[in-house]
């Protein structure tokens, strides 16, 4: 009897989405980039901590750039050419993440700042005295 080799690997489904959303959450400690389609279904994500940056290095602009490039390289097979960028948070990785999207070769259609602004809601954290 001949032994039959079976492969249980799934084939990659190549979808042609064309247009998507990129959400950049830039906090003081980390940067998280999520790529979704127009309906809001998440396709890929990456964070500075997941990319190997630890401690204070997570909040650098270079870490945000590498994170954005990694998240967009994951969705290269989906055929996304145009993106809408939504930025949330006060972190310093905001601008460098947007520049990384442009350097990858994707066309940025719009940039929106969706940082939540309180109308005198919760009491803020105490100011640091260094």
UniProtKB/Swiss-Prot annotation:
Keyword rRNA-binding: yes
Transmembrane helix recorded as keyword: no
Gene3D superfamilies tied to this protein: Ribosomal protein S11
UniProt xrefs under InterPro entries: Ribosomal_uS11, Ribosomal_uS11_bac-type, Ribosomal_uS11_CS, Ribosomal_uS11_sf
Keywords per UniProt: Ribonucleoprotein, Ribosomal protein, RNA-binding, rRNA-binding
A GO term for molecular function: rRNA binding
GO biological process, one term: translation
UniProt xrefs under PROSITE patterns: RIBOSOMAL_S11 (PS00054)
Role played: Located on the platform of the 30S subunit, it bridges several disparate RNA helices of the 16S rRNA. Forms part of the Shine-Dalgarno cleft in the 70S ribosome.
Complex formation: Part of the 30S ribosomal subunit. Interacts with proteins S7 and S18. Binds to IF-3.
Stated name of the protein: Small ribosomal subunit protein uS11
